[in-house]
Structures are given as structure tokens and as C-alpha cells.
Amino acid sequence: MNYSSFLVVRVIPIMVYRRTEKVVRRLAQRHAAIIAAARATAAEAGMAAVQIAPVAERAGIAAGTVYRYFPSKTDLVAALVAAVSEAEIDAMRRAADAAPGPLSGLATGIATFAARALARRRLAWAVIAEPVDAEADQVRRVYRRALAAEIEMRLKAAIKAGALPPEDSTRAAAALVGALLEGLIGPLAPAISAEPAATRDTVQQLTLFALRAVGVTDPRARGLVVQLPSDGPLAVG
């Protein structure tokens, strides 16, 4: 037999690359740094200023590195909207959960949202209302729905406890979201002084309006607003 006619094939094992915890952590930190840089940029100059190159410079990395995480500006803006939205909903939820009762939770949640929006009004406008691409706008709509759902949950809890009259909580929540956004950062919103006292008064007035709108009697609504912790939502700076 002519063994020279046989083809000898060597099987070389292929090592499957697996990211170590250190690599995963580093990637997550870089992702967070990019989002933080984009957030700071939007807070200063609006969403239109969120471009790959300046965000990369602010984050201290190369523009090519940003593209590895976000292939386009649209992807970066959508991720920024999602990150900020999630943080705001979480802050609102934690504040409301810490309140002693359902009506207090509703008041505290609304006040927290209002105070944080006023403290970062330019960023709030960029995330909520400034014109963006369709993809980012879709993420924005998800945020609005999440905000309405959070308020609706508080309304249902108050209705169940007998603290509010029966009502269509879904429509009421949607109406409150529209009123709050327009009253805080919309084109019809009046100019607001940066002085803490002026900010506090605005938050109290909007919270009072929201409570009255869903059926809280005026004395009770005023009592809830007065009881808002000064070191809580009204102290956001």
C-alpha cells in the first residue's frame, strides 16, 4: 500500500474566548463613562450637542472606541435617553416607596420628579422634549409610559385605600404627566428663578395642582405638600 497517497490532517483545538469578570467590568465602566459624558454634554448644550467626537473627548477615550459601543449618534442618544429615564423613574419610585401612606407616596413621587426636572432643566428638556431621531423618540415614549405607569400605580393604591374617589387612573395618570411636563419644561412653562426658594415654591404649586386634579380636597392637599420632607425631593440641587 502506498501510504504517501494518504492525506494527514492535524486537528488543532480552537480555544473559545470567554470574557473574564475583569474584562466585563472594564467594558461596563467604559460604557458608563460614555453615557456620563453624553449626559454632561446634553445638560450643558442640549441633545444636538451630543456628537460622537466631543463625547469621546469628554470621556477621555478615542472616538473609535465610542463607535464600538454605539455605532451611530442615534444609538448614543437613544441609550442616553434610556439611562436618564431609568434613573428618574427609579428616584421617583424610591421616594414614593419611603412615604408613610398612598397619598403621601403620590405627593412625594410627583414632587421628586418635579424637583429633579427643575434642578436639571436643560437635561430634562433634552431628554423629554428636544427634537431627536425617530429611534430616540421611541425610547422617549417608553419613558413617558413608564412615568404614567408609576403615577397610575400610586393612584390605584390611594383609590384602593379609600383616600381618593374612584376614577379612571390610566387617563388621570396620562393627564398628570402631560400637565407636569408642560408646566416644568414645556414651551408654555414660565421662567423659573434658580433660587432654592423659587424652585421649592414651583414644586409645591405643581404638586398641589396634581393632588387637587385627582380629587384630593384642598386642606388635605395643602397638608400633604407642607409635610414634604425638606431634605428629600425639595432639596434636590
Language model segments and positions:
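Helix-turn-helix
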Residues: A33, T41-D75, A79
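Short linear capping/connector segments at secondary-structure termini
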Residues: R94, A126-A134, V226-Q227
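Generic hydrophobic, amphipathic alpha-helix propensity
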Residues: L27-R39, V55, L80-V84, E88, ...
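Hydrophobic alpha-helical connector segments
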Residues: A79, D90-R122, A173-L176, R200-V203, ...
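Short, hydrophobic secondary-structure boundary micro-motifs
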Residues: Q51, A124-I128, E167, P219-L224
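Amphipathic alpha-helical packing segments from all-alpha helical-bundle domains
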Residues: I89, A119, E135-A161, T170-I185, ...
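C-terminal peripheral helix-coil segments that are non-catalytic and often amphipathic
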Residues: M1-R18, A149, M153-K160, I185-A189, ...
